[in-house]
């Protein structure tokens, strides 16, 4: 929950010999608000995960009340900014459905939320079909494809 934590984590992983292009930094949309810091993270090659879509629409974050979270429109704006800088192949998105109350059955936004609400918003904001496809299909596929250790340079 500290804005410097992602870079500290990446430094530790790098010093341990990790291949940073296989690392996902989750919850960046609630941790990193400074675009210079986001750029520094992106330049490592790690995946940039904005995974709180549909969560905390008021911007209030109970785990750190001093932070005012982005809403979904702000998240999409940040994603557009990342795309403009050439980081499309590093972007991951999700909605962090970890509790029953987030399911549609219990009044939450549900699993369909990204396809029903966020993808159309991305298109309205000028994110191309190719870029949406890369974020929704290409990047998860690349991340989840096993890589033989000999093909995984440190």
Regions found by a protein language model. Give the residues of each.
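A general structural detector for well-ordered alpha-helical segments in enzyme core domains, enriched
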Residues: 9-12, 37, 75-82, 114, ...
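Acidic (Asp/Glu)-rich catalytic clusters
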Residues: 11-18, 38-45, 82-88
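Short acidic/histidine-rich active-site segments
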Residues: 50-52, 86-108
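Active-site glycine- and acidic-residue-rich loops that bind
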Residues: 23-35, 55-79
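Active-site beta-loop-alpha junctions enriched in small/polar residues
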Residues: 1-2, 26-31, 51-55, 97-100
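Structural preference for beta-strand elements that scaffold enzyme active sites
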Residues: 20-24, 45-49, 90-92
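Mid-to-C-terminal alpha-helical segments outside catalytic/metal-binding sites
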Residues: 113-154
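Divalent metal-binding pocket/active-site signature
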Residues: 1-32
């Amino acid at each position: 929950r500290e804005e410097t934590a992602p870079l500290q984590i990446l430094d530790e992983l790098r010093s341990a010999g990790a291949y940073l292009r296989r690392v996902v930094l989750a919850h960046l949309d609630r941790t990193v608000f400074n675009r210079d810091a986001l750029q520094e993270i992106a330049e490592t090659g790690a995946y940039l995960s904005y995974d709180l879509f549909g969560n905390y629409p008021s911007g209030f974050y109970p785990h750190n009340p001093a932070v005012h979270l982005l809403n979904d429109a702000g998240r999409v704006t940040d994603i557009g900014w990342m795309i403009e800088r050439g980081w499309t192949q590093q972007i991951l998105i999700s909605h962090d459905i970890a509790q029953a109350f987030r399911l549609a059955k219990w009044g939450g936004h549900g699993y369909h939320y990204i396809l029903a609400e966020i993808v159309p918003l991305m298109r309205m904001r000028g994110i191309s079909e190719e870029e949406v496809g890369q974020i929704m299909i290409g990047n998860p596929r690349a991340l989840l494809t096993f890589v033989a250790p000999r093909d995984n340079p440190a």
